[in-house]
Amino acid sequence: MPRRSDLHRILVIGSGPIVIGQAAEFDYSGTQAIKALREEGYEVILVNSNPATIMTDPEFADRTYVEPVTPEFVEKVIAKERPDAVLPTMGGQTALNVALALHDSGVLAKYGCELIGANARAIRVAEDRKLFGEAMEKIGLRCPTGRTVTSLEEALSAVEETGFPAIIRPSFTLGGTGGGIAYNREEFETIVRRGLDLSPVHSVLIERSLLGWKEYELEVMRDCADNVVIVCSIENLDPMGVHTGDSITVAPAMTLTDREYQVMRDAAVAIIREIGVDAGGCNIQFAVNPTNGELIVIEMNPRVSRSSALASKATGFPIARIGAKLAVGYTLDEVPNDITKTTPASFEPVLDYVIVKCPRFAFEKFVSSDPGLTTQMKSVGESMAIGRTFKEAFQKALRALETGRSGWTIAERLQDDRLTEGSKEELRGALRRPTPERIFQLKRAMLLGMDTKELYEITAIDPWFLDQLRELIDAEQWYEKLTGVDAVSMRRMKRLGFSDRQLGALRGQSESDARAERWALGVRPSYKMIDTCAGEFPSSTPYLYGNYDEESEAATEGRKKVVILGSGPNRIGQGVEFDYCCVRAVLALREQGYETIMVNSNPETVSTDFDISDKLYFEPLSLEDVLEIVHREQPEGVIVQLGGQTPLKLTRPLEAAGVKILGTSPDAIDAAEDRRRFEAIARELGIEQPANGTATSVDEAVTIAQRIGFPVLVRPSYVLGGRAMEIVHDEVSLRDYFERAARVSEERPVLVDRFLEDAFEADVDALSDGTDVVIGAVMEHIESAGIHSGDSACILPPYLIPAAAVAQMKEHTIAFAKRLGVVGLINVQYAYKDGQVYVIEVNPRASRTAPFVSKAIGVSLPSVAARLMLGETLAEVGFTQEIIPPYISVKEAVFPFNKFREFDPVLGPEMRSTGEVMGIDDDFGAAFMKSQLAADNALPREGTVFFTVSDGDKPTAASLAGKFHSIGFSIMATSGTAAFFREQGIPVTSVLKVHEGRPHGVDKILNGEVQLLVNTPLGKHAQVDDEKLRQAAIANRLPYTTTLTAASAAFEAIAARRTREPVVRSLQEWHEILRAPGAVESATAGSTQPAGVA
């Protein structure tokens, strides 16, 4: 069938911020879908609140609305733009839930809008556990024994049928949020209550546990003519009980018999037909009983998913792109395969290689949280690797995680493998409970002589995988004993995925010595193409992976080449913002005629899409892998400053190996990162810093702290995301910090800074061509000093820091850029206190604010930076003047505290946010309100504000309580705070602290008597009370703030919401305002200063 001609305007709903369970894969999917629809001549409208995405850049969709992805705001966009259709399948669970809400409330019918890609019935039947179970029964397939319930009483009745352990799965949530495995009644009641609360329809499925069954996924596509293709099979290495996002996964499935696969395939085809997904793709999860092959259907996602992004990268079959074409009426045989250009999408992909995906976790950021892996997803990112065998791909995927392991290696310290003594008995206990370290504990168990049969009985990991892992140990032991290494034995080990570092360690060599030996033997990787057809048809897209076969399929062209190093797996501190920067650089350099070569290992991202760069190497970002690619490609140079800390760490070793680093020199990067060199430069430029010192021992740190005065900020050098950073108030706490968090030595110094309490902080992004410098933006942090810049909301342009101080920050930034010889991007962080500007740190690289600034000012900073690195000047690029918008942009952070309930959700100097959102409006209050709605922190319009604050905060809190009272809110406070408020004449209700008796503050929150919590940490003695309040707020989805500056901003937002409707404009319209004559000049003159919020 030809494309539908009755549709002209299509609204794509994005997924909003990066959260656990819904990450960069939806930027990738959405970007593909938008490109596919515009190719067909449709006008595309996008709603997405995440500024760090490529899809929200204004040139992708015709109209881009950076607005909250909520029914209310999507309705406003529909009312304004009047699209003919809504495509909800590219924005994860968020988009599906919003689309269904708009359908059910009659909004879509009112505006004559239809759902395409998946209709309302298909979404409802697939997502509603009860309806899905009934649909499976109708086609003769089994789901786990269980019952859908809407109350705790019903749940307790259901669990009598299923028994323990029981699985709890909430309906309509993402990443298993709110679900879990209960082994007893107490756990069961806790998880059910949470699941009912977090499910938008307040229903959960209670099902019989299938722990120990094997878990599989199929990616399936269907068109309007009822053609169905299976794109990819995926097998979870971990058995049922671990969320698929937290499991190591393998494609294609390895341990299914041919008959089992055919049964599963037939089931998948029957399922997609019965559910009614008739123009797009879906992901179907199955469990297989390892003893008799019995098949059970777990669930289906009627949309693109994390697994479909993985399947797309694994096969080269672009599921989202093809799904968008199917949604507008094409059939599979009418859509060409973009990789081969000669075969249609109705040809199922065939793999002649193996893919392994490994999840990346962030438990080090949430130390008190439970590292056990269950049905609720906890990983924050993932790596993918491609090899000729499972063993090769597995080791490469572990290396690509960038957690310090060079392959399947056990840690030097037992505690790093989550063990204390490493005995067989301890290992047996540890292996029964899935954690991120279990895969390494398995190696320890094998080295202690535990056999496959015993390990299978303990872990339920299929014996095939256990035997594959054992063969890696056998190979290590064989290699260790060789008297000499020749090319044959070296190639054998490389084909098993062993890195140079691993091979060196086995024979007492350094990594560089092992590499030199390998090169001397003439053993170097070849590169093969991913072509969707196992080499049956020629591939036109260079999408490559390294291996140690003799034959290479990578052709090298004669054009000038640039290698861009990506950022690897997403993690807290290094997220999709850096992928955005890499993609913008690639696109800018392609426009300038360069051959762009992307190196990355993250299957979720736009940068690893087959058509973004001229050539994609899907390889780990290790020195070994990058050196081999540079050796083969011989580029003009390598760009390291856009991918965060991952490529920056490679700067010095690459330079030492003779590789040209483009842009800012490695020496300048080192001068900014090395505290002693940086201090000397700041002194030379006459720029103030907080008093500080560098310690190489605990005693030295204590001496420095006593000299400069407590409180101090302590942190290791060369970290991203504030890793192991803390504010310390006394010597005892300082010594405790070194015991817990930081190993200190000459090679690993720790920085000790005087902490500037109650200072304002600001970020400045700028561009330099080596001679001239232009400010990109100055952003003021809403949270006060001491909270990591990545976790603080920020506003552009600044609103409380005096104009003279802002001007001084700009001057300092220009001075640093010139002194360091920056070519490309630079980010500088400042503090302002008592009339003095202090520099905190200088980063001569892309910062995580670059995408936000690019959206706010209408200029892509990374695109300009890439051209500067290749020798153009700011004047030649056309960016010669700072742009200060006449509107307000707010960036807000989004946190995963709902996944880590045991962790105290208080903000500090260590970054914990997973993503960000943006709010844009004409004034601060409305922009901040939008940012809170987008971050799922909806502020109340009325009700009770509960204050519990430290003594030093009481005067400011009283002023704020008075403001809330003046607009009709009731005020509640703990005794000390309440007494102070009464002295100021503020009506207030007293409430007990947790240790004072019942009913206390937590009871009030749990009973729904509080609509906003303002809680500033009260010091050690009240820590337990504080923590319980904040955890209750998280559990009850109650908006809360832990700083008074954020509470002031919340007041402004609530007041704005009560006085006017928010402005809904597309990004293109906001940028038109910038281009209006005199707009930027008037802004520069200070006309955009919003009302103060403190």
From Swiss-Prot:
Residue sites binding Mn(2+) 4 per the record: E841, N843
One annotated Gene Ontology cellular component of this protein: cytoplasm
Segments of this protein annotated with the region Carbamoyl phosphate synthetic domain: 553-936
Primary enzyme class: ligase
Region (Oligomerization domain) location: 403-552
Transmembrane recorded as keyword: no
Binding site for Mn(2+) 2: E299, N301
Function as written in the Swiss-Prot or TrEMBL entry: Large subunit of the glutamine-dependent carbamoyl phosphate synthetase (CPSase). CPSase catalyzes the formation of carbamoyl phosphate from the ammonia moiety of glutamine, carbonate, and phosphate donated by ATP, constituting the first step of 2 biosynthetic pathways, one leading to arginine and/or urea and the other to pyrimidine nucleotides.
Protein's name according to its UniProt entry: Carbamoyl phosphate synthase large chain
Gene: carB
